[in-house]
Amino acid sequence: MAEGARQAPAPPQTDRPARLDLNELIHQPVRLSIMATLAHAERVDFAFLREHLEVGDSNLSRHLTALEEAGYVLIDKVFERKRARTWLSLTPIGQQAFRAHVAALQRLVAVR
């Protein structure tokens, strides 16, 4: 694996408590909301996400930076019609991490 490359999280182990498979980085409410929104779209505009989640620019930026540093989110800043625009999307590792987190949540809340 190349230096600096991210590795996908290990698949959850079903023989241990589901809470141990929760992803602490994703589990924070704003970051979980970001991941859930991005999981349902190819890409999302920063302004749309800010309004959709009802958070401020700096708060959203801070959480996006944490997710980007983990390799979960791609932040693409472009100029369109002489205007800066920021597009956000999940990376393949981010998609896998989100699916694993959701699976752990489902196991955690399942009636036994």
Could you tell me what each predicted segment is?
Residues P17-N59, E80-K82, W87-S89:
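N-terminal helix-turn-helix DNA-binding core of bacterial DNA-binding proteins
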Residues L64-A70:
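Basic amphipathic alpha-helical segments that dock to polyanions
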Residues L90-G94:
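Accessory beta->alpha helical hairpin/"wing" motif in late/C-terminal subdomains of nucleic-acid enzymes
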Residues A70-A84:
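Beta-hairpin "wing" of winged helix-turn-helix
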Residues M1-R19, S33-A36, Q96-R112:
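Amphipathic alpha-helical dimerization/coiled-coil segments
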